[in-house]
From Swiss-Prot:
SUPFAM superfamilies: Apolipoprotein A-I. It comes from Rattus norvegicus (Rat). This is Apolipoprotein A-I. It comes from the Eukaryota. GO terms for molecular function: amyloid-beta binding; apolipoprotein A-I receptor binding; apolipoprotein receptor binding; chemorepellent activity; cholesterol binding; cholesterol transfer activity; enzyme binding; heat shock protein binding. Belongs to the apolipoprotein A1/A4/E family. The gene is Apoa1. Transmembrane segments: none annotated.
Length: 259
């Protein structure tokens, strides 16, 4: 019952983000989410792209053109795979450095959130207690109405409506009171966030990290260049084969027109 009341209160008053905050004791880091999303996205593009190429080659036009796109797509896929393998350690190093350099900021923000959470918990407990009291009072008022059901259904319906409206009004008052208390902490959170942003802007670590990030990106570019050159060399035979095939088709079409 306690979990249900807290869930209703949080979703009703603060939205899904607050619910997420309460539910995730050890949320996945932002960097892990970015890396996982990129991996899933690239794999999805590769799989869906191959499906489209396969459908095109199976069509009448694809059979007439005979471009061998599927074979070339597999070649391209293996080339991109090698590129990912070569860049993997470099990007992993970049994300690790970024996470390490911003660890102090995440710790400070987590402290602020935990502090607000602890201050809000007594109000949530109070709301739960009032919720239980109102539900029990509602049940007691409904209990005698059950015996009157066989006597007068319309009269019972009227009583039910009155009791339901009274219960709704009481819970609305309790919810408004809880929302007002949460509003105070929302203002505090905004002030804390503004203060943290000011600290971040003027923090020597951030200025130092800007230089480090530039160095990391420069290193990433230098290490990625050989892999990108390899990708370009792998693509050239594919592009040349397509170009030769298309030019051959154009020449053949010209001959037929001139004949």
């Amino acid at each position: 019952m306690k979990a249900a009341v807290l869930a209703v209160a949080l979703v009703f008053l603060t939205g899904c983000q607050a619910w997420e905050f309460w539910q995730q004791d050890e949320p996945q880091s932002q960097w892990d989410r970015v890396k996982d999303f990129a991996t899933v996205y690239v794999d999805a593009v590769k799989d869906s792209g191959r499906d489209y190429v396969s459908q095109f080659e199976s069509s009448t036009l694809g059979k007439q053109l005979n471009l061998n796109l599927l074979d070339n797509w597999d070649t391209l896929g293996s080339t991109v795979g090698r590129l990912q393998e070569q860049l993997g350690p470099v990007t992993q190093e970049f994300w690790a450095n970024l996470e390490k350099e911003t660890d102090w900021l995440r710790n400070e923000m987590n402290k602020d959130l935990e502090n607000v959470k602890q201050k809000m918990q007594p109000h949530l407990d109070e709301f739960q207690e009032k919720w239980n009291e109102e539900v029990e009072a509602y049940r007691q008022k409904l209990e005698p109405l059950g015996t009157e059901l066989h006597k007068n259904a319309k009269e019972m319906q009227r009583h039910l409506k009155v009791v339901a409206e009274e219960f709704r009004d009481r819970m609305r008052v309790n919810a408004d009171a809880l929302r007002a208390k949460f509003g105070l902490y929302s203002d505090q959170m905004r002030e804390n966030l503004a203060q943290r942003l000011t600290e971040i802007k003027n923090h020597p670590t951030l200025i130092e990290y800007h230089t480090k990030a530039s160095d990391h990106l420069k290193t990433l570019g230098e290490k990625a260049k050989p892999a990108l050159d390899d990708l370009g060399q792998g693509l050239m035979p594919v592009l040349e084969a397509w170009k030769a095939k298309i030019m051959s088709m154009i020449d053949e079409a010209k001959k037929k027109l001139n004949a």
